[in-house]
């Protein structure tokens, strides 16, 4: 008969296995709901689980091929991409799934409702999502308050953007407000220039605009680092739809300006591999399995162009452990999950952590 101590050690693993195995049933119920409603129900469930102390039933965050990126020690290679926890309400809930880092947002200086609903669509047979959310979020101040009680021991990223009614000529002011608002509680900040759902936002990826913004943010970094006696790395998230010469130009720019990291990629406007699917003609950014090959090829090309000068966080179409390992093989240092997590649940996190650890040890 096992001792109480043995039972105590086994319980967290048992609960995790039960959670992973029950996900298909839970997903079946959630997928009966409208996509955004299902998302809200999931977030509410995670908040209730935290309030009831149920997150403590799960195993503590384990290290697997830990890596230092931009001066931050990531306990494993797998993170949650921005977009699932826009308001920073469920950092501990998602962290309990085994993510080594959690990125919240996109947060803008002022709260905004985003685009009209419906704005989130499942392409179930293709294991894909189309969203045109439009940076719906409570604003950087509320995001800070929401995340203030977290106990998650991993890395916290804060994804920042501009408000929809801020013209591009004044976008830098919004990003400065976001950087200042996140500085004392974020481990890193991601500058989102690549969402297709805010009019004109992707224009900020043009080389001259991007150069000016990076220089403005880097100057502010120095001021904030001196004021707070801590450094917060700044990454930029870019689109998979960049033409090769545009991507190459940005890679040169990132190296010259000493950017600390790049997230590749955001969602795509392409509808390749979704032809004829229900909802495939909806406006918005496509994520999930149809983006997998495009995103991995993008990471591989970008890695060659950066030549190790700065780290890449690979995202886009990771639906299995082998997909995550392929991103590392292509040149990413870390990976992030979004749509794959919606379709496969917590089991995908563990699978990706294990596959990435094997891939990291082999290289």
Please describe what each predicted stretch is.
Residues 47-49, 54-61, 196-209, 252-308, ...:
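Glycine/Thr-rich beta-alpha phosphate-binding loop at enzyme active sites
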Residues 112-127, 273-284, 340-363:
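C-terminal helical cap(s) of enzyme catalytic domains, especially alpha/beta-barrels
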Residues 105-154:
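A gly/proline- and charged-residue-enriched helix-loop-helix capping module
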Residues 18-67, 131-136, 140:
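An N-cap/entry alpha-helix motif that binds or orients negatively charged groups
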Residues 103-112, 193-195, 261-269, 318, ...:
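Glycine-rich phosphate-binding active-site loops on the catalytic face of alpha/beta enzymes
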Residues 163-176, 203, 209, 235-256:
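Active-site glycine- and acidic-residue-rich loops that bind
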Residues 87-94, 242-254, 308, 318-335:
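Catalytic cores of alpha/beta
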């Amino acid at each position: 008969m096992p001792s109480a101590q043995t039972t105590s050690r086994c319980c967290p693993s048992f609960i995790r296995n039960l959670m992973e195995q029950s996900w298909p049933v839970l997903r079946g119920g959630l997928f009966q709901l409208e996509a955004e409603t299902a998302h809200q129900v999931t977030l509410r469930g995670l908040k209730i689980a935290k309030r009831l102390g149920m997150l403590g039933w799960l195993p503590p965050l384990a290290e697997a091929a830990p890596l230092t990126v931009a001066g931050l020690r990531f306990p494993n290679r797998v993170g949650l991409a921005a977009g699932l926890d826009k308001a920073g309400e469920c950092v501990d809930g998602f962290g309990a799934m085994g993510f080594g880092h959690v990125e919240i947002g996109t947060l803008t200086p002022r709260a905004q409702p985003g685009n009209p609903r419906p704005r989130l669509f499942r392409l179930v047979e293709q294991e894909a999502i189309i969203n045109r959310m439009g940076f719906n979020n409570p604003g950087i101040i509320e995001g800070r308050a929401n995340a203030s009680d977290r106990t998650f021991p991993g890395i916290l990223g804060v994804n920042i953007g501009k408000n929809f009614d801020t013209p591009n000529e004044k976008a830098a002011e919004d990003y400065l407000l976001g950087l200042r608002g996140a500085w004392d509680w974020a481990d890193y900040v991601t500058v989102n220039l690549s969402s297709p759902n805010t009019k004109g936002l992707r224009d900020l990826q043009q080389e001259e605009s991007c150069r000016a913004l990076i220089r403005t943010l880097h100057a502010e970094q120095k001021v904030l680092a001196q004021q707070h006696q801590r450094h917060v790395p700044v990454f930029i998230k870019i689109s998979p739809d960049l033409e090769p010469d545009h991507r190459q130009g940005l890679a040169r720019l990132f190296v010259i300006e000493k950017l600390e990291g790049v997230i590749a990629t955001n969602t795509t406007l392409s509808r390749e591999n979704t032809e004829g699917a229900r909802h495939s003609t909806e406006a918005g950014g496509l994520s999930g399995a149809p983006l997998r090959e495009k995103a991995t090829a993008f990471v591989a090309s970008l890695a060659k162009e950066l030549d190790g000068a700065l780290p890449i966080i690979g995202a886009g179409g990771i639906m299995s452990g082998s997909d995550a390992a392929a991103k590392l093989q292509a040149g990413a240092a870390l990976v992030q999950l979004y749509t794959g997590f919606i379709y496969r649940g917590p089991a995908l996190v563990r699978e990706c952590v294990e596959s990435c650890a094997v891939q990291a040890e082999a290289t």
